[in-house]
Amino acid sequence: MKRRQLITAMAAAGATLTLPARAKNLGKVTVGFTAVADFATLFIGKEEGYFSKRGLEVEPKFIPLNPSIPAAIQADSLQMGGPTPSVYLQAVDGGLDHVVVGGAGMTTKSSTGVGFVARAGSGIKTAQDCVGKKIGVPGLGAYLHVSFRAWLKLAGVDYSKVNFIEASFPQHGD
């Protein structure tokens, strides 16, 4: 283990020792989540009593569109939330004083957990076929929107010629 990693690990371990004592003063915490599997741990933790054992009353709150999370935190409708990295970075770049508590996932160039689905009969079979089409994403500027634009660019398609609209997952079939 490198020295920097060791120091970081020790600091993180030391910081976690104080969490139970500090958590007892937090009371109710409303946590915003979107309809993705990453938030399963939130529900498991609540069901298993992880939060209540530490003096926290955690209330999960469904947020249909990921880019709404920073604004909801700013307005104190949520105390915590899970925006995608691109949404978080845009919020902080825009002047919101938010911090990251912890990460929930990791994506690499070889990740295959995300895909693009087109309705039968849409005529969409390649990236080029998306030009002039209306594509629904669960948040403009969010992870799937940014990733889709990157995929189009890699395929040589000008993503500005694709009409992206913001739609929550249940609406994508429409």
Where are these regions (language model features)?
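N-terminal export signals
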Residues: Q5-A23
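Short, glycine-/small- and polar/acidic-enriched structural segments
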Residues: K24-S168
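Short, intrinsically disordered, charge-balanced linker/junction segments flanking boundaries
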Residues: S168-D174
